[in-house]
C-alpha cells in the first residue's frame, strides 16, 4: 500500500537533528563487528579550501559522515564520541578577530551547544589535548576509530593503543540506510519544495525558448523557498537530448521539440530530493509520446505497488523490464516472444539503467552494494542489490529512451535485431526519452511517497495549457 498524504514535517523539524542517536547506532554497529570495542570515534568536517590560484573559498559542502554524527554545517570542525562514556564533543573554530570584519562573528560555543545535539562544545585548539586526556584514561587496548584520509596531519592519537581506520566509514554507511523520523521530515521538506519547483517549470515551459531559462525557474524557486543547494546538477533535456541519461548542458533551444525531461532536486539541511518528470513542451503529448509515457507510468506504478519491507530490489527491477517489454510489444517496437526478449536482454536497449537507488544525504546514497562488474547487462547498473529495510528511502525511476548510440548496436546484432521492428522504431526517435522518478520511504506494509510533483499525463497537460 502506498501513502501519499503530505507529512507534517514542520512539527518534527522544530526539534534538533538526532546526531547523538546516530552516534549510538554507529557505535552499536562497531561493537557488533568488534566485540568489546572501547575508545572513541573521531571525525573531521570539511575544511575551508581556496580555489586554485585564487583567494576565494571553494563552494562548501559538508562531509556527510561528519554531518550524520553532528548535524553541524560549519566548516573546519572536529568531533569526538566517547563510546564508553556515551559522550559527544564538537570542536568549532575559535574567533579570529581579523576575520570578523569580513565575515561577522562566528557561532559561539554556547550557540553551538544550543543548536546541535552534542554533549559538549570546545574549540578546535583543544582537540589534541582532549584526545590525549581521554585516551590516557582508557583501559589498555582502547581504539580510536577514524576514516582514512580524513584526519589532519596536526592531529595525534598517541594515547590510544589501537588506531582503527577500517570500520567507521562502513559503520556510518550501513547505518545511514535506515532513516529516523527527523531525517524523513527533512527529506519530505526537500521533496515538497522540489515538487513545487517541477510544477513551476511546467507552468513556464511553453513560454520560453531555451532550456537554461527553465533551469533558472527551478533554481529560483528552490532558492526562494530556502533550498539554496541542489542535490545534483539539474538535467533539463528537451527533445532527443532526453535520451542522454545525465545530460547537463541545459542550453539548447527548444523550438520544434516534443517533450522536456526535467530531473532536478533541491537539498534541505544536507538531505537530497531526486525527482524526474517528462511532459510535452506545447501542452499536448503526441500519440507516440503518450504511448511511451503510459508504459513508463505503468512501470513505475506497478513497481511502487510491489514495494514493502524485505522485498528484493533485483526482483522489482526485473518487474520493470517485464512491463517495458509488454508495452513495447503492444506498440510494435518490439516483436516476438516476450520471454525470449527478456532472456536476450534486448529491453536493455531501451531501459539501460537501474530502477533506482538509495537516497539520503547523497543523491546516490550509501549502502546499496552495487555490482558494476555483473556480467548480466540487465543488472549491471542497479545501484541497490538486496532486500529493502523499513525506513530506507529509494528512488523509483523507470525510463524508456531512444538513444541512437545505444540502440544502433542492438539493431546490428542478429541476437537482438530480430526482436526490434526498425520501421516502427523510426517513428519514436523524436520522443527522446521518458523517465518518471519519485522518492519512496519503505514501510512494513508498503511505501510512503515523499514526492508530490504532478505526473498524471492529463493533469500535466492541463497545467501547461492553462499557464
Swiss-Prot record:
Cofactor detail note: Binds 2 manganese ions per subunit.
Binding-site positions, Mn(2+) 1: 274, 397, 437
InterPro entries linked: Aminopep_P_N, Creatin/AminoP/Spt16_N, Creatinase/aminopeptidase-like, Pept_M24, X-Pro_dipept-like
SMART domains: AMP_N
Pfam family, one: AMP_N
Gene3D superfamilies noted in UniProt: Creatinase/methionine aminopeptidase superfamily (3.90.230.10), Creatinase/prolidase N-terminal domain (3.40.350.10)
UniProt enzyme class: hydrolase
PANTHER family linked: XAA-PRO AMINOPEPTIDASE 3 (PTHR43226), XAA-PRO DIPEPTIDASE (PTHR43226:SF1)
Name the record gives this protein: Probable Xaa-Pro aminopeptidase SMAC_04549
Native source organism of the sequence: Sordaria macrospora (strain ATCC MYA-333 / DSM 997 / K(L3346) / K-hell)
Organism placement in taxonomy: Eukaryota, Fungi, Dikarya, Ascomycota, Pezizomycotina
Amino acid at each position: 500500500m502506498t501513502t501519499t498524504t503530505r507529512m507534517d514535517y514542520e512539527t518534527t523539524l522544530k526539534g534538533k537533528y538526532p546526531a547523538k542517536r546516530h552516534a549510538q547506532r554507529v557505535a552499536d554497529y562497531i561493537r557488533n563487528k568488534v566485540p568489546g570495542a572501547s575508545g572513541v570515534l573521531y571525525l573531521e568536517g570539511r575544511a575551508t579550501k581556496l580555489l586554485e590560484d585564487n583567494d576565494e573559498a571553494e563552494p562548501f559542502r559538508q562531509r556527510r559522515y561528519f554531518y550524520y554524527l553532528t548535524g553541524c554545517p560549519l566548516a573546519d570542525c572536529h568531533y569526538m564520541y566517547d563510546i564508553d562514556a556515551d559522550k559527544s564533543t564538537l570542536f568549532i573554530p575559535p574567533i579570529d578577530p581579523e576575520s570578523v570584519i569580513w565575515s561577522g562573528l562566528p557561532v559561539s560555543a554556547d550557540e553551538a551547544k544550543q543548536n546541535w545535539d552534542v554533549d559538549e562544545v570546545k574549540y578546535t585548539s583543544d582537540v589534541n589535548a582532549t584526545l590525549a586526556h581521554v585516551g590516557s584514561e582508557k583501559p589498555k587496548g582502547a581504539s580510536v576509530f577514524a576514516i582514512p584520509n580524513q584526519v589532519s596531519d596536526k592531529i595525534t592519537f598517541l594515547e590510544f593503543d589501537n588506531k582503527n581506520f577500517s570500520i567507521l566509514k562502513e559503520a556510518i554507511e550501513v547505518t545511514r540506510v535506515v532513516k529516523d523520523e527527523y531525517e524523513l521530515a527533512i527529506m519530505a521538506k526537500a521533496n515538497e519544495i522540489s515538487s513545487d519547483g517541477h510544477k513551476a517549470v511546467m507552468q513556464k515551459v511553453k513560454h520560453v525558448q531555451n532550456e537554461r531559462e527553465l533551469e533558472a525557474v527551478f533554481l529560483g524557486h528552490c532558492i526562494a523557498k530556502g533550498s539554496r543547494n541542489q542535490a545534483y546538477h539539474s538535467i533539463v533535456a528537451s527533445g532527443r537530448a532526453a535520451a542522454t541519461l545525465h545530460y547537463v548542458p541545459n542550453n539548447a533551444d527548444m523550438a520544434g521539440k516534443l517533450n522536456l525531461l526535467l530531473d532536478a532536486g533541491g537539498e534541505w539541511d544536507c538531505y537530497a530530493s531526486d525527482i524526474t518528470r517528462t511532459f510535452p513542451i506545447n501542452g499536448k503529448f503526441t500519440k507516440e509520446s503518450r504511448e511511451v509515457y503510459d508504459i513508463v507510468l505503468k512501470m513505475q506504478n506497478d513497481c511502487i505497488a510491489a514495494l514493502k519491507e524485505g522485498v528484493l530490489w533485483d526482483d522489482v527491477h526485473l518487474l520493470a523490464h517485464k512491463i517495458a517489454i509488454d508495452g513495447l510489444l503492444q506498440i510494435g517496437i518490439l516483436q516476438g516472444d516476450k520471454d525470449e526478449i527478456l532472456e536476450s536482454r534486448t529491453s536493455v536497449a531501451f531501459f539501460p539503467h537501474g530502477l533506482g537507488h538509495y537516497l539520503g544525504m547523497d543523491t546516490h546514497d550509501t549502502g546499496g552494494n552495487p555490482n558494476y562488474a555483473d556480467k548480466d547487462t540487465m543488472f549491471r547498473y542497479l545501484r541497490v542489490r538486496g532486500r529493502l529495510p523499513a525506513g530506507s528511502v529509494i528512488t523509483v525511476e523507470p525510463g524508456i529512451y531512444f538513444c541512437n548510440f545505444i540502440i544502433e548496436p542492438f539493431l546490428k546484432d542478429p541476437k537482438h535485431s530480430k526482436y526490434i521492428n526498425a520501421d516502427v522504431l523510426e517513428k519514436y526517435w523524436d520522443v527522446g526519452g521518458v523517465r518518471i522518478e519519485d522518492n519512496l520511504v519503505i514501510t512494513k506494509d508498503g511505501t510512503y511517497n515523499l514526492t508530490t510533483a504532478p505526473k498524471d499525463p492529463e493533469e500535466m497537460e492541463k497545467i501547461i495549457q492553462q499557464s
